[in-house]
Amino acid sequence: MAVFTSKINRKSDLFNNNKEDFTKLIKKMEDIHLRAEKVSERRRSKFIERGQLTPRERLSKLLDKDEIFIELFNMISFLVDDDNHDTSISGGSIIAGIGFVCGVRCVVFVDDSGINAGALTAKSIDKALGCLDISLKQKLPFIHLVESSGINLMNYTVEFWSNTGGMFYGLAKLSAAGIPTIAVLHGLSTAGGAYQPGMSDYVIGVKKNGMAALAGP
């Protein structure tokens, strides 16, 4: 096998200028990621009032301590629903990634109900399909923390939502392949948000808080 030796001069002006520019871009990206967390955090008082954890607190308590969590697709939806670079929120109202639960590597999918009540955007579906595909190919259990008002009907167009059924098809494929699908229903979930528990192999409902309704309460 041929050996390729780097010829980068780490002391050169070119290298250091590129490093500085790239570091600034990384900081911008991190600020965009943090924006979604800050917007969700504004609803903290409502979560406390309902006796709930915030989405990120719930995720943190689910994951094994001292194990890495690799967040996936966290730039999705940026400049899609809002074309203003300074206000657009990335992530598609979902926190998703790969982490360990009781020592088992899993795909974890969390509805961020602090953002538009967890309503799905057009790109939320793409994020879900990507996570389901990873779960199937890597044979990783799929855990969904469910609290969603379903599709955002205020921005509904057929062409954007035509692949929504792929989410349910993906869950069915995982189940058929013997890969566990687990839904934790911990809040009010309507319409599309209610299908997830119904199609999962295992459902955990939080007493007095978890509720699913196909059309409305």
Question: Which residues make up each language-model segment?
Answer:
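Short alpha-helical segments and helix-capping/turn motifs at coil-helix boundaries
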Residues: 82-83, 92-95, 127-130, 167, ...
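A short, small-residue-rich loop immediately preceding and capping a beta-strand
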Residues: 106-109, 118-120, 140-145, 178-189
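Short glycine-rich loop/turn motifs
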Residues: 92-96, 105, 140-141, 168-171, ...
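Thiamine diphosphate
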Residues: 70, 84-89, 123, 158-162, ...
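Extended active-site and interfacial segments that coordinate phosphate-rich ligands
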Residues: 113-135, 201-212, 217
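Conserved catalytic cores of soluble enzyme domains
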Residues: 146-217
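Intrinsically disordered, low-complexity segments enriched in small/flexible residues
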Residues: 2-106, 112-117
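A structural preference for short, pocket-lining loop segments at secondary-structure junctions
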Residues: 95, 99-112, 127-154
